[in-house]
């Protein structure tokens, strides 16, 4: 099925997409999305600690003499104690899930309120308020992503900041916020769809590493130029520092596919897309 037909099919099939009611891991008959949470009886909640002063990908800029503060680059990465890949675990007692009902079946998402608290709160509040009702999956790109949730501003009444966690990744099935730049999250989100096979065929980690080598050269060339800010604005998402990514993360993408360069926790210029759920 080509991309055009798939896009058209989704636009029709999810005309009634989501709202929220509190249930325990089960659906109801309505065409809506539910967010539910069961009492945590066995597993304590994970505490995610934001530690902006720890070494991150942004240190590369400082190593070549770029003052990140003057560029407004102030990363606040959430460092989590869960193992790499935990987002693929099945929901347990105490976890929060959302069920999106469509005429082509349900989409169940496990939400991550500890790792992306403000983003999950925004999603739940919008859904409870019925803001996602009758919204569309407006764009479907085969082996890339499904875009949806365009229903206006955030539940906070304005765009809000990114929440990059070093244990949540844009692997296949990950749900992340759409944005138009740093800290511009509102209501829209996307579901990553790139398969492991496509990821490999596109060059995998070698392709990403070569891209980063090229970006490093350009950053060094622009570092003393008044064009540096413009370069970062245009190429920010591509400033994915593969030198700082652990082998366990590389393996995760090799096995599951996804769009690694969208991860903000390993981006040298604090750009990326907040992951807040997993299908």
Regions found by a protein language model. Name each.
Residues 16-20:
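Core hydrophobic alpha-helical transmembrane segments of single-pass membrane proteins
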């Amino acid at each position: 099925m080509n991309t055009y037909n798939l896009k058209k099919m989704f636009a029709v099939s999810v005309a009634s997409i989501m709202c929220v009611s509190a249930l325990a891991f089960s659906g109801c008959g309505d065409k809506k999305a539910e967010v539910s949470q069961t009492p945590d009886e066995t597993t304590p909640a994970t505490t995610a600690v934001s530690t902006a002063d720890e070494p991150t990908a942004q240190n590369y800029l400082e190593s070549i003499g770029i003052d990140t503060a003057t560029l407004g680059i102030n990363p606040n990465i959430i460092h989590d104690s869960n193992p790499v890949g935990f987002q693929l675990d099945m929901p347990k007692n105490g976890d929060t899930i959302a069920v999106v009902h469509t005429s082509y079946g349900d989409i169940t998402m496990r939400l991550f309120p500890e790792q992306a608290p403000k983003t999950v709160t925004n999603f739940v509040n919008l859904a409870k308020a019925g803001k996602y009702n009758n919204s569309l999956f407006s764009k479907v790109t085969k082996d890339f992503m499904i875009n949806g949730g365009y229903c206006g501003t955030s539940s906070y009444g304005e765009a809000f900041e990114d929440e990059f966690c070093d244990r949540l990744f844009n692997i296949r099935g990950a749900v992340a916020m759409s944005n138009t730049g740093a800290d511009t999250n509102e209501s829209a989100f996307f579901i990553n769809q790139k398969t492991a096979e496509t990821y490999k065929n596109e060059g995998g980690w070698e392709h990403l590493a070569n891209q980063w080598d090229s970006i490093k050269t350009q950053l060094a060339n622009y570092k003393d130029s008044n064009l540096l800010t413009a370069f970062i604005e245009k190429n920010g998402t591509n400033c994915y520092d593969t030198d700082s990514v652990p082998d366990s993360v590389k393996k995760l993408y090799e096995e599951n596919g996804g769009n690694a360069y969208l991860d903000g926790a390993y981006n040298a210029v604090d750009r990326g897309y907040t992951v807040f759920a997993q299908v």
